């Protein structure tokens, strides 16, 4: 199922020098977001930088949101992860998509112009309405805290 999402190109290199975000395969859940900068950026160990993607999206449908997730290779091989761990794009947001990159590694890492930085994934949203109760019905899990259910 394909859902139309409005996309605004903020940098003229998108669609010419660099491709529009797209799914790489039929089974892909995310589309790659690229570093659309004027110069290569070197991120020092412990440093966080905000990197433009050259696009904005307007999801519009309140039953959907977009999330920005890390690319596994950058984190595993180079220690480059998202500074906010996950970026949440609400359906009514219309501003530029930026990627917060944090170098948690021990070596400087350079992001070149056009490098793939993160993935954009669209997810369903359910807006909850709280129902106040005095007690919960019992469950197998109960109110046990962190680590309560063990590892095995």
Curated annotation (Swiss-Prot):
The keyword Phosphoprotein does not apply. One of its GO terms (biological process) is dUTP catabolic process. It comes from the Bacteria. Pathway: Pyrimidine metabolism; dUMP biosynthesis; dUMP from dCTP (dUTP route): step 2/2. It holds the Pfam family dUTPase. The keyword Magnesium applies. Substrate binds at residues 71-73, 84, 88-90, 98. GO terms for molecular function: dUTP diphosphatase activity; magnesium ion binding. Keywords: Hydrolase, Magnesium, Metal-binding, Nucleotide metabolism. Its cofactor is Mg(2+). It is an enzyme of class 3 (hydrolase). It catalyses: dUTP + H2O = dUMP + diphosphate + H(+). Its EC number is 3.6.1.23. PANTHER family: DEOXYURIDINE 5'-TRIPHOSPHATE NUCLEOTIDOHYDROLASE. Belongs to the dUTPase family. This enzyme is involved in nucleotide metabolism: it produces dUMP, the immediate precursor of thymidine nucleotides and it decreases the intracellular concentration of dUTP so that uracil cannot be incorporated into DNA. This is Deoxyuridine 5'-triphosphate nucleotidohydrolase. The gene is dut.
